[in-house]
Amino acid sequence: MKLRIEIDSGLTETEIVIKAAALTDEIADLQRLLQETKAPRLIFYKGTGEYYLDLAEILFFETEGSKIYAHTQKEAYEVRLKLYELESILPRYFSRVSKSTIANIRQGYSVDKSFSGTGTISFYQTHKEVHVSRHYQSLLKENLRNMR
């Protein structure tokens, strides 16, 4: 693989172009890595405090009433964004799994499927689980395939 960097002071935005004969796993990994480096810095709220957590610590985001909560292994923090806003800015390792939940698929260790077509994601080192609806089952499967 060849790498070339061109400096152009006239550019207003950085552009990355990858030329290849085919889309390989190596190129897909590189694309994923580049996308994850621009992950947003979210503010999480609990009580009167503001917290700045690493997105990798978040297991899932879910709605509860009119509020959105981000769950870690032990805590839950309020996020002042809507799920569709989060979905558009979160890295690719977050996947919509139901109408009310976005899960960090890197933190999940199993997906148990039921006969009705729904499922449950279990996370490492916690009792917390999330429901996967039938509607989002194929999206989750595709995202897991792309991540592994």
Regions found by a protein language model. Give the residues of each.
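N-terminal regulatory/sensing modules of transcriptional regulators
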Residues: 1-28
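Conserved binding/recognition cores within well-folded domains
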Residues: 26-125, 129
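N-terminal low-complexity, intrinsically disordered tails enriched in Ser/Pro/Gly
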Residues: 146-148
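C-terminal structural segments of small proteins and small subunits
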Residues: 127, 131-132, 138-139
